[in-house]
From Swiss-Prot:
Taxonomic path: Bacteria, Pseudomonadati, Pseudomonadota, Alphaproteobacteria, Sphingomonadales
PROSITE patterns xrefs: MTTASE_N, MTTASE_RADICAL, RADICAL_SAM, TRAM
InterPro entries for the chain: Elp3/MiaA/NifB-like_rSAM, Methylthiotransferase, Methylthiotransferase_CS, Methylthiotransferase_N, Methylthiotransferase_N_sf, MiaB_methiolase, rSAM, rSAM_horseshoe
Protein name: tRNA-2-methylthio-N(6)-dimethylallyladenosine synthase
Species of the source: Rhizorhabdus wittichii (strain DSM 6014 / CCUG 31198 / JCM 15750 / NBRC 105917 / EY 4224 / RW1)
Residues reported to bind [4Fe-4S] cluster 1: 20, 56, 94
Cofactor details (free text): Binds 2 [4Fe-4S] clusters. One cluster is coordinated with 3 cysteines and an exchangeable S-adenosyl-L-methionine.
C-alpha cells in the first residue's frame, strides 16, 4: 500500500461481507458504486481484479478471519498461471475502522483501507491505489455517504435499508460506538425515497436496519417529529411493499408507539429481535445495559399483548467477566421465561479498547464452552418447539429463492422461518401455504393459493 507502483485499473470486483445485516447492506451499496464506475461483478474472489473484504470487528474470531482471507487470496494468486496479476485487495468495514493503517503494516498486500462511514469514496480510493498512491479513508462524516450513493436499481424480493447508524449506549463489551460512531438517523425523505426505489426494483419486503434501529428519530414531510413507528406507518402506505421488518433493537428504545405498531400495522411482520444479552441484573449492570431482567420481561409482555403471535428473538453472551454459575443460571431463567422463536448465543470475546476487556474475573474458556453448550441446547429446543407449533397453521410465505430439488422454492413465513414449498411458485410472489411439517431449522408448506405479484 502506498509503495508508488501503478497497476491497471480493475475491471471486475467481488465483495465478501462478514457479520451483521448492515454489512450486507453496505456490501451491496459498494457493489452498486463499483458497477456505476463500469466494473462488473465476478462470481468469486478468484475471478476478480478487485476483492473487497467487508469486515466485522464484533468478535476476535471475525476480525482475525480477514487476515486469513488476505493470505488465501495472495497464495492463490501466487499459485495461479503466469500472467494473472494478484487482485487489488480492499479491506472495508469495522476492522478497517478499528485498525486503520495497522492493516497494511500487518498485511502489506492490502491496497485499500476504507471505514464503514467512508465507503462512498471507494471509487476514488481504487483509482488512487491503481496509481500507487496511499488509499486509506476512515473518516466518520455524519451520514454524508448516503447523499452520494447511486439509486437502487435491481433487487430481489427482500431488501435491507439502513435507517440509523452508530450507537450511544456504550455497552462495556461492544466496539460499535468506536467503529460506527455516534447515533445518527437518516432523514425521513431519503429513507422513503430509497424504499420506493427498492420496491420499484422488485423488493416485496424491506428490513429497516440500524445498530440501534429503534432509536431512529426524524421529521416527517410535514415537519412533525417521528420515531421508528411513524416511519413504519409511512412505509406501510407504499404500494407494492408487502412486508416490513426491523433490526436490531435496544430495550430502552421500545417506545409505546412502536409496541402499538406491532398490533396495528398490517405489513409489520410478527417478529421482534430484542437482545437482552444476560439474565443477571449484576451482569447487566456490568455490561452497562441500562435495564434489568424484570424490565425486559415487562417489555416482552407488552409486545405480546399488542401482537399475541409475535416471534421473539434475542442475543446472549456467556462468560462475561465476573459471570458466576448463579449469574448464568439467571440467563437460563430469562430464556425460559421469554421462550424464544430463535436466538443467537456467543462466548464473550474481549475487544481491545472496551472497558470489559480489562475487567477482573475473566472467565476460563472451558467454562464458557460448557455454558454456551447448555444455553444453545435450550435455545435450539425452544426454536424447534416454536416451529412445531406452526404445523397446521395457514400463512403467507414470500418466495425468495430456489430450493435444492427441481421445482422446489424456499421462502419466509411471517415469523422469519424458512419454508420449503413444492410446485415452483415464482420467486418474489406471496403464496398462501398450510404448514405440514417442521424441523429444527425449517418448515414444509403445501401451496393453497397464489397472490399476484
Amino acid at each position: 500500500m502506498g509503495r508508488g507502483m501503478s497497476r491497471p485499473a480493475p475491471k471486475s470486483f467481488h465483495v465478501k461481507s462478514f457479520g451483521c445485516q448492515m454489512n450486507v447492506y453496505d456490501g451491496a451499496r459498494m457493489a452498486e458504486l463499483l458497477e456505476a464506475q463500469g466494473m462488473h461483478a465476478a462470481d468469486s474472489a478468484d475471478a476478480a481484479d478487485l476483492v473487497v473484504l467487508n469486515t466485522c470487528h464484533i468478535r476476535e474470531k471475525a476480525a482475525e478471519k480477514v487476515y486469513s482471507d488476505i493470505g488465501r487470496i495472495v497464495k492463490k494468486a501466487a499459485d495461479a498461471e503466469e500472467g494473472r496479476a494478484r487482485p487489488m485487495i480492499a479491506v472495508a468495514g469495522c476492522v478497517a475502522q478499528a485498525e486503520g493503517p495497522e492493516i497494511p503494516r500487518r498485511a502489506p498486500a492490502v491496497d485499500i483501507v476504507v471505514g464503514p462511514q467512508a465507503y462512498h469514496n471507494l471509487p476514488q480510493l481504487v483509482a488512487d491505489a491503481a496509481e500507487g498512491r496511499r488509499a486509506l479513508d476512515t473518516d466518520m462524516p455524519a451520514a454524508s455517504k448516503f447523499d452520494t450513493l447511486p439509486k437502487r436499481r435491481r433487487q430481489g424480493p427482500t431488501a435491507f435499508l439502513t435507517v440509523q447508524e452508530g450507537c450511544d449506549k456504550f455497552c462495556t463489551y461492544c466496539v460499535v460506538p468506536y467503529t460506527r460512531g455516534a447515533e445518527i438517523s437518516r432523514p425521513w425523505g431519503a429513507i422513503v425515497d430509497e424504499a420506493k426505489a427498492l420496491v420499484d426494483a422488485g423488493a416485496r419486503e424491506i428490513t429497516l436496519l440500524g445498530q440501534n434501529v429503534n432509536a431512529w428519530t426524524g421529521e416527517d414531510d410535514r415537519g412533525r417529529t417521528q420515531g421508528l413507528d411513524g416511519l413504519i406507518r409511512a412505509l406501510d402506505a407504499l404500494p407494492g411493499l408487502a412486508r416490513i421488518r426491523y433490526t436490531t433493537s435496544h430495550p430502552n428504545d421500545m417506545s409505546d408507539g412502536l409496541i402499538a405498531a406491532h398490533g396495528e400495522v398490517a405489513k409489520l411482520m410478527p417478529f421482534l429481535h430484542l437482545p437482552v444479552q444476560a439474565g443477571s441484573d449484576r451482569i447487566l449492570k456490568a455490561m452497562n445495559r441500562s435495564h434489568d431482567a424484570a424490565g425486559y420481561l415487562r417489555l416482552i409482555e407488552r409486545v405480546r399483548a399488542a401482537r399475541p403471535d409475535i416471534a421473539v428473538s434475542g442475543d446472549f453472551i456467556v462468560g462475561f467477566p465476573g459471570e458466576t454459575d448463579e449469574d448464568f443460571e439467571a440467563t437460563l431463567a430469562i430464556v425460559r421465561a421469554v421462550d424464544h422463536a430463535q436466538a443467537f448465543s456467543f462466548k464473550y470475546s474481549p475487544r481491545p479498547g472496551t472497558p470489559a476487556a480489562s475487567m477482573d474475573g475473566q472467565v476460563a474458556p472451558a467454562v464458557m464452552d460448557e455454558r454456551l453448550q447448555r444455553l444453545q441446547a435450550l435455545l435450539n429446543e425452544q426454536q424447534h418447539r416454536f416451529n412445531l407449533a406452526t404445523v397446521g397453521k395457514r400463512c403467507e410465505v414470500l418466495i425468495e429463492r430456489d430450493g435444492k430439488k427441481p421445482g422446489q422454492r424456499i421462502g419466509k413465513s411471517p415469523w422469519l422461518q424458512s419454508v420449503i414449498v413444492e410446485d415452483g411458485p415464482a420467486i418474489g410472489t406471496l403464496v398462501t401455504v398450510d404448514i405440514v411439517s417442521a424441523g429444527p431449522n425449517s418448515l414444509s408448506g403445501a401451496l393453497v393459493e397464489q397472490k399476484a405479484a
